[in-house]
């Protein structure tokens, strides 16, 4: 077959094609030939070669068209309604009206009617929202797409479809593949409005599947049989494509493509990726790698990998804080008996703050002289004073082999060791250059055990000091002696840090420091960098090195040596030499030749004695060569050598497996085995100056082998001992199993089944203190504001779970169950077959006892402070087009908008279907989205799986309301349960609707909707129409009132940034005391949002997660208040609320009382330029002079307390460098100014170490924690404060506990809060027992009964609601009808009660009469002001009459004297003085004729009525009646050294209370 050449092809005219106009021709896209047109090619143009015949593919015939029907309104109506309500079309019932579908929400109804009116461009029927959708469809009839649906449909294609997917494409596919007519196509398109994809479809295939699914759903809804087919065009296109592609795979085409590539590469100057030389190099590298792997293996490489990183170093220097904490803890217990060991422990930590504490506590006063004397002396450690132990191996009845230890004789290690050396005639235990130093060593040991030795001002490096090791005990001894110790660890930072932090807090004495450094001694690089860090970065010089790092090689004999044994040899020998060599280099570089560093070599008598230990013996033998090198090499000026032959040391990492046969070694081998403590003391003694200086002249050898090297047949005897133990254990185990089988047989007839232990869930009501007749504050219940309920939702879920983690660091079984429920891991079922918890996913039963084991890890990893999900932040970059873009379809409105923005740089042409074809041309500017990788984030997030539906909130509300408002709603419901109120409507049986206030605030409000309003709108995304309202800070409290409370009281929304919650309490207290409200909801709420987090990061306020990760910090460690390494706060989200109540209302309702709000104060910080800078304006809360006592003092004095009675201070403590020093400074100055006793520091609570910083609810969570502290007496410690900042040491009025402290009770607390924008606030809280002291004993018992009934019912209701997912009972309508609303709001006596017979609410009247004391203007009454007043004051320090029995007999009645006898010795003087002051004030008030200064005052009797002082008894009553007085109101106020009484005579027509007169 001949082929025509190019020259033979007839020439055609030159045709120029453009991609913008001739895209179809350029891409060889052909349409269907017109009917009747000859589709054969014109062979006269080009004679193409003949190809082999391709078999014709059987193509399925085109689908038969389905008869088209006009589009009716119901399709569009259902789609728009479903889209607005966020439901599927199948959930929209055409028989229901818009009003019914919207649940009566007027906003949604209004929006839908507006959209439908705009869509159909015609007048809708009257009250269209009340008409069913079917009737609305009948009224509108046949329709077409309107403006609303076209706009929404265009948005779907723009935002969710892939590129080049247009309406026209979809219509073509629906016609070709599905055979749908134009109107049916429109119906499918409309269905997309209610089933919009969640995100953009990434491919055309995914888009086709999406539209095919909608088409199938459309057919099913109409009962149509739709059949998908392949069109002839598609089939032909596939065939032609296959033919077109086939030649491309030919050899000639590939060769041409390769030549083109080479030409372009050469022209552009691009280097060939690989050359022959590169290939040779790669082969050589591969050969070397194979050789390395064959010789050492991958395990060897991993074992020598580098670990050292100076950024991950942990420092511990806060010995002073640990000492203060321990002494204060001991002083809490009056039954403590001081021992010599306890005394010495504190003497070695003596410092000025500790002396003050000892002076202030009678229990510790005997320590004061010793502490003062020890301040100027270095700390010492007494070595060898421990009890010596011997091993015992026992086989239990169950066949378990256990190792025990018993005391030797003599029990003191010094005495025993000395006698053992003499008894065994052992010589040269310690020798140097042939000289026997054994006696010197023993004498030194005796001296160290009696007088102690000091390691102060010395620096030691110890490797291999893990838990249970000899090195770990040496570290303890060195820290006790005041040394600076650098310890290395190869473990992960967190577990190692926790261990050494605890070790330092127990053993660190005055001046000691502990540095924990990550390090792998098997790495040469690590060895060099470690020594460089010590000498270059820290600027230290080592006094001694103890390279004790080792690794176990048990079971490795010479025929099984592998890479791990080689790595161990490198670690224990080769790199020990390198390590000390690097020290020599550093010393020589610095010219240090007069202070040689002592190297303590860990030698061993085990030179193959035990066997099966790899290269252990060889590495120990190799170290011995340093003793000879000392004389033969040149580094004796820089190093001194001390070799220690370490004997059998029980329970270490290397010898733990041999503990079972240690008794055999002592009995049969006459070997002395040592405990870790004993061996540690012996080695520590070698570091003392007396023995260390001996090493400078010649190496010292210490033989602590315990005769192990003399045991010749050790291996065989030990093997026999192990076999004997196994035999005994097998025998005992067999007998135990036989006994168990016999026991089961005896019980086989019993039908009793074991009962699974169930976990009891509780709300956590406060314990009720016993009645105390000695507590009688001069107040009435109505004067008090108390906390009757509280709740929170935060990173740990509820306040109960947060308290467990804060105070204990772990969850209780009930805590696991509650958190698993909250995270949707379990759910409760109650049916015929099973009652209990089941798995949230598979529904299988889960026993209560199995929940911690099954879900514990998931709970702890998905709650608290943890890493945020990675998120790419979307930003836009503006680009100027350099060439025209391809055209795209869009609506006319969009086309006009684009033309208005870009002008002549956009070309618009109208299509027949009403859409427009738009092309952006060169020169136009567009913004292209790009993703910026957000830095890693950490925050305190709500537990994973938390959802408002779990609490019973309906789905339609969840979709409408901002997420943070839902958190607040759930939190408020829990707060009412914690108050014993399961139905908030119960409140209105006791108070009016207007007397319940809502003071919950926020700093940011609904940030999700704020982001949508300002960010999503710019992206033309679909934004909820009522998003604006959700951004207001008062909207969330409004939702609480609308959906749950239904009150008519004030909603005041404080905005105080991080101090919002405390500002909320301050406002509520003012409202209650002013009589505006009786119960108030207070607190704060805030959410997390990326933009906000980025703003904090730019301010350098939050922690840099990347830096923290580089320092080896886990997310849970990154919030470290008061720690020297703190670097910023960690954000968190959530809500916290409290329910405040007037005291008399709380008593009447029987509400639980968690605490008293004794006083609050707020202040600002004056002139400045920094909004977030912490200030000291709150010092005004402590301002006072001789005439005006401080607000703090006054708040405490009302309850009979003084400034020394404050026990704890809850600090704002955000973990920022500035705040955590400024805040303690403020409190220090306040306490000093108010005269707090030195040596009685406040326990500082830093809650944010476990919660992070939630902004607005911060103080609410802190207040919840303080209330829990009041109830339990447990002060939670700040476990993340690994090294309390030395700058805080001077604040002697504060102690910063790092572990929880159980006190004997808390009387009062101080809460401090700070917020951006000069918000400073403080709160004083008092224990509820002082409020209950206002009651008489019968009143107390009556309250106890009411309270018990209430909390029992609330506990049952809460657990039931939790198990049925109905904690939040959303109110759908008010408890009264519209006709009653006005009368209820206008009548202050209106109350709402639940009628139990009908289970409905009814309106009643209050039992107390309505106040009608206001007089009309024409009433002729005298001026209603009090006619008489009397004031008197008594100075307590000069009042001594209480010691005079005659004075008491003449001036106090029998009843008054009985009351005085109940007072304690301390308060007796104050009680007598206040009574006398009150009598004098009453006498002046009566204005009667005086009988003289010496007249008895017993005729004026002061008694208590409901806790308040009352008069008008005896002759005083007659005098008052004669003066026309109805009663005398008496007020007593207390200062530090004075009492003031004010008596007001009130006439019968005067109805104003004393408080209003004073104002």
Swiss-Prot record:
Pathway: Mycotoxin biosynthesis; sterigmatocystin biosynthesis. Induction: The genes forming the sterigmatocystin biosynthesis cluster are co-regulated and induced on oatmeal porridge or the fungal isolates were grown either on oatmeal porridge or in YEC medium (0.2% yeast extract, 5.0% corn steep liquor). Expression is positively regulated by the cluster-specific transcription factor aflR that binds the palindromic sequence 5'-TCG(N5)CGA-3'found in the promoter. Residues 873-1327 form the Ketosynthase family 3 (KS3) domain. Disruption phenotype: Fails to produce sterigmatocystin under conditions that supports production by wild-type. Able to grow without exogenous long-chain fatty acids. GO terms for molecular function: 3-oxoacyl-[acyl-carrier-protein] reductase (NADPH) activity; 3-oxoacyl-[acyl-carrier-protein] synthase activity; fatty acid synthase activity; holo-[acyl-carrier-protein] synthase activity; magnesium ion binding. Residues 1105-1117 have a biased composition (Basic and acidic residues). This is Fatty acid synthase alpha subunit stcJ. It comes from Emericella nidulans (strain FGSC A4 / ATCC 38163 / CBS 112.46 / NRRL 194 / M139) (Aspergillus nidulans).
